[in-house]
A protein has these predicted regions:
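Substrate/ligand-engaging "lid" and interaction regions
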Residues: 1-188
Length: 188
């Protein structure tokens, strides 16, 4: 059955900043553990708990705050939780044989200001939470850029990623949060 929706943007952004962000972050975490395919992550209960917590406690909180006036069952707490659980199950489907290298490729794009990971971090910060797991993954992505570009620090890597973005307060707050391991987030 086809259900028409008058506004698809919240659904598209939820897929991008929810599913796509966590897929990338889960891939980075799995790669760090020596895994080569996403279904291997599904066999690691601790890693899947990490992914569900990142999705539900960080990404979903930010998305619910962003779309708090949008009326649809998926945008409720239960709806988002069900969405997250379903998405995680699909991410680690063994029949896909999804290579982690494919999932984690192009960190420069995936850590872009308006892209999946940083966009999710921004939504979470705007909801007043510190998205520690997402930030940890962003740092891992920056580490990959450092290696690929022979940079000495994450600041240089982040400068490369965000070179086209003019500086403003929100950007500086997010930059500081990602680069400083001891700082809590503040609502921006």
């Amino acid at each position: 059955q086809f259900i028409s929706k008058p506004d698809l943007d919240p659904f598209a952004l939820t897929k991008f900043h929810g599913h796509n962000a966590i897929h990338y972050c889960l891939g980075l975490e799995a790669k760090e553990r020596g895994m080569t395919f996403m279904h291997q992550a599904g066999e690691d209960a601790e890693l899947m708990t990490w992914a569900k917590e990142a999705f539900v406690d960080e990404v979903v909180v930010g998305l619910r705050n962003e779309f708090n006036n949008f009326k649809d069952d998926i945008f409720t707490e239960d709806g988002f939780t069900a969405y997250a659980e379903d998405a995680l199950e699909r991410m680690v489907n063994p029949y896909l044989r999804d290579p982690i290298d494919r999932v984690t490729r192009d960190p420069i794009r995936k850590l872009g200001w308006d892209d999946r990971v940083v966009g999710s971090i921004r939504f979470a910060m705007n909801a007043g939470i510190n998205p520690e797991k997402m930030i940890s993954s962003a740092r891992k992505g920056l580490n990959e850029i450092m290696i690929a570009q022979s940079f000495q620090n994450r600041t240089d890597a982040l400068n490369l990623v965000w070179q086209e973005i003019p500086s403003f307060q929100e950007l500086e707050s997010v930059r500081e949060l990602i680069l400083n391991t001891n700082q809590d987030c503040e609502k921006v």
